[in-house]
């Protein structure tokens, strides 16, 4: 697995398409335990990302991630914009000036993103957030790299785990965001941020 600047841009366009296609479902999930706007906010933000990618040229992947992060922070409402934006901005610091990335780079970027989300959101695994997907997936990817699995196998297994972890969020009480106001009543519902994280990981796996 090796992605250059153009490959990364293509994957981001695909992510925007997937988010847009699933915006109603994401917002419906959010309506059950939040503000009901997660899908539409995410769609708006990623469509703006596509617009920026088409209207500008980039010499390296770090510059792309930095732009994506800034666009998401500026254009996605609620908690999602700052969190997803922070994820890309943190990843950008690692791939700064890189023109190609491989599975090892992706693994570091993902953990950088997770660390940024933890700090920005003051959250951790078990709080019923996107971290319930992203941290276990990051840990799995690192483990499979050490076991010398091929990149495609790693990503396939990561997506399987991500799906399981989305389902797991139905079983726990929300401790962050508007959903936390519901207390025990938040049990039984998927976390929309966890689900959008799964969709993005699945899209990445299918398009590289």
UniProtKB/Swiss-Prot annotation:
Q: Return the GO cellular component terms, semicolon-separated.
A: cytosol
The EC number(s) this enzyme carries: 2.7.-.-
- Give the Gene Ontology MF terms in alphabetical order: glycerone kinase activity
Q: Report the enzyme's class at the first EC level.
A: transferase
- The reply on keyword tRNA processing is no
List the coiled-coil residues.
none
Question: Which biological process annotations from GO are given for this protein?
Answer: glycerol catabolic process
Matching InterPro entries: DhaK_L_YcgS, DhaL_dom, DhaL_dom_sf, Dihydroxyacetone_Kinase
The record's listing under Pfam families reads: Dak2
User: Do the record's keywords include Cell inner membrane?
Assistant: no
Residue stretches making up the DhaL domain: 6-206
Record SMART domains: Dak2
Provide the protein name: Putative kinase MCAP_0235
């Amino acid at each position: 697995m090796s992605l250059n600047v153009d490959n990364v841009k293509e994957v981001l366009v695909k992510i925007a398409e997937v988010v847009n296609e699933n915006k109603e479902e994401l917002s419906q999930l959010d309506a059950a335990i939040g503000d009901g706007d997660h899908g539409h906010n995410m769609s708006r933000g990623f469509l703006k990302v596509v617009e920026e990618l088409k209207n500008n040229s980039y010499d390296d992947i770090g510059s792309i991630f930095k732009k994506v992060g800034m666009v998401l922070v500026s254009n996605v409402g609620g908690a999602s914009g700052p969190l997803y934006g922070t994820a890309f901005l943190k990843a950008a610091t690692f791939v700064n000036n890189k023109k190609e990335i491989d599975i090892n780079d992706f693994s570091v970027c993902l953990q950088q993103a997770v660390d940024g989300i933890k700090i920005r959101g003051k959250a951790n695994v078990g709080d019923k957030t996107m971290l319930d997907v992203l941290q276990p997936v990051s840990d799995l990817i690192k483990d499979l790299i050490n076991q010398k699995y091929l990149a495609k196998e790693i990503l396939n297994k990561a997506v399987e785990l991500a799906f399981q972890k989305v389902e797991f969020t139905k079983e726990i009480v929300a401790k962050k965001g508007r959903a936390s106001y519901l207390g025990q009543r938040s049990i039984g519902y998927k976390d929309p941020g966890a689900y959008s994280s799964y969709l993005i990981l699945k899209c990445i796996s299918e398009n590289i």
